[in-house]
């Protein structure tokens, strides 16, 4: 096949999490059909991918859910070896697309933030070369399962205009936080399809950190260097666990459906060992050890992280190879051209600060009312060294965001 017969498409995803202040864990609801396997697979994929990215220096932040959704729409049109590799990479169950539909609808339900106390939305779109022979059944699958919008664009005649249109859509879906997802040169006259996912989350903590309690204090980097950063402080009742290697704290947002879980190694240089050892099973086991503690003294840095990734090499290292060269995406189209993925692009942003709603400040569970009850043993969770954090949907169990903070000032 000549080079002129080879065409490409892009898979892109964008994620934003903006958060503020502190509360209590919401018990997970029984998973709908297909949720459990899909969610476990998404978590496993996210940690596999994180394992490839963790060798990069500095802070990290990504949305495993966003990347999995974008690749899921792509896999829906894959066949043969390409489909086998993508299914294995994504840990997809047999009913993955239908299960994704259930999860996406659950995440987007009651979109009014006044009803559930936070804003969470996920949006998918398929940007197709107009006039190209796309299969109607493929379009129906991605619209039904992934709630994707379909847009006809003209990559052939106006690739830069198409890129601008897609980037504008991403900006709108992420409330102007993710800009220029597709960089110059990523869309060309050879592009035939771009698949995008955007996920946006903004939540207030159940009970706020008071700004007057935030102080500039030392944060110890992995090499022992100390930097002054704003450390927020609050004492209250939280889900907490610890072992010899790390401490775990769960910090739910207003509405209690979404929470941030922080995994804090005991030592400033202990993060690489925790990262290397973390699997979906071990993460689940750690979460199951969380117990309410009546008095937890929490120090947490105020921070922002923005990261961009071109995921071609990490995905190929995990076994998704044929999708980038010699792919079989015949489930998408009836054209005679060879379609390969040219790039998988992901961009994510997180903002953590003190802000919150004072209306729901009662967060603890008081056990025992007799005068002889022993006083609670105070716990101290001082995140003044590198740590892992993830933002989870407690209803479906989905890991929406996953990150690492090594330096709040970076």
Task: Locate predicted features.
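N-terminal secretory signal peptides and thylakoid transit peptides that target proteins
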Residues: 2-16
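C-terminal segment of N-terminal export signals and the immediately downstream linker at the start
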Residues: 23-45, 49
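N-terminal targeting/tethering segments
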Residues: 43-63
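Non-catalytic, conformational "gating/processing" segments within enzyme and secreted inhibitor domains
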Residues: 57, 96-268, 273-274, 284-375
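Short phosphate-coordinating micro-motif centered on Lys-Gly-acidic
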Residues: 70
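Alpha-helical support elements that line or immediately flank enzyme active sites
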Residues: 73-77
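Primarily short, surface-exposed interaction patches in extracytoplasmic proteins
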Residues: 87-90
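C-terminal soluble interaction/assembly domains
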Residues: 348, 354-410
């Amino acid at each position: 096949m000549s080079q002129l017969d080879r065409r490409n498409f892009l898979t892109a995803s964008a994620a934003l999490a903006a958060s503020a202040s502190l509360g209590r864990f919401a018990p997970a609801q029984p998973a709908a059909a297909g949720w459990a396997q899909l969610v476990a697979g998404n978590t496993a994929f996210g940690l596999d991918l994180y394992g490839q990215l963790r060798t990069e220096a500095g802070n990290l932040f990504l949305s495993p859910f966003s990347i999995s959704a974008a690749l899921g729409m792509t896999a829906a049109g894959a066949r043969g070896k390409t489909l086998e590799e993508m299914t294995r990479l994504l840990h997809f169950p047999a009913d993955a697309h239908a299960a994704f539909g259930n999860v996406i609808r659950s995440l987007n339900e009651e979109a009014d933030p006044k009803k559930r106390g936070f804003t969470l939305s996920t949006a998918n779109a398929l940007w197709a070369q107009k006039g190209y022979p796309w299969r109607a059944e493929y379009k129906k699958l991605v619209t039904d399962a992934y709630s994707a919008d379909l847009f006809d664009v003209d990559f052939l005649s106006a690739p830069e205009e198409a890129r601008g249109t897609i980037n504008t859509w991403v900006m709108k879906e992420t409330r102007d936080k993710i800009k220029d997802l597709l960089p110059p040169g990523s869309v060309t006259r050879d592009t035939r399809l771009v698949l995008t996912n955007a996920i946006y989350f903004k939540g207030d903590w159940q009970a706020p950190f008071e700004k007057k309690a935030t102080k500039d204090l030392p944060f110890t980097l992995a090499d022992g260097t100390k930097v002054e950063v704003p450390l927020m402080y609050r004492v209250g009742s939280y889900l907490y666990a610890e072992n010899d290697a790390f401490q775990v704290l769960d910090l739910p947002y207003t509405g209690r459906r979404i929470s941030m879980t922080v995994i804090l190694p005991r030592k400033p240089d202990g993060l690489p060992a925790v990262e290397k050892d973390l699997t979906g099973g071990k993460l689940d086991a750690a979460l199951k050890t969380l117990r309410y503690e009546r008095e937890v003294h929490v120090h947490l840095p105020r921070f922002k992280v923005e990261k961009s990734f071109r995921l071609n090499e990490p995905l190929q290292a995990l076994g998704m190879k044929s999708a980038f060269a010699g792919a079989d995406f015949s489930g998408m189209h009836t054209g005679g051209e060879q379609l390969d993925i040219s790039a998988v692009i992901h961009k994510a942003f997180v903002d953590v600060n003190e802000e919150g709603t004072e209306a729901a400040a009662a967060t603890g569970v008081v056990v025992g009312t007799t005068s002889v009850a022993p006083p609670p043993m105070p716990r101290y969770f001082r995140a003044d060294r590198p740590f892992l954090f993830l933002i989870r949907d407690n209803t479906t169990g989905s890991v929406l965001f996953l990150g690492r903070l090594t330096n709040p000032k970076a």
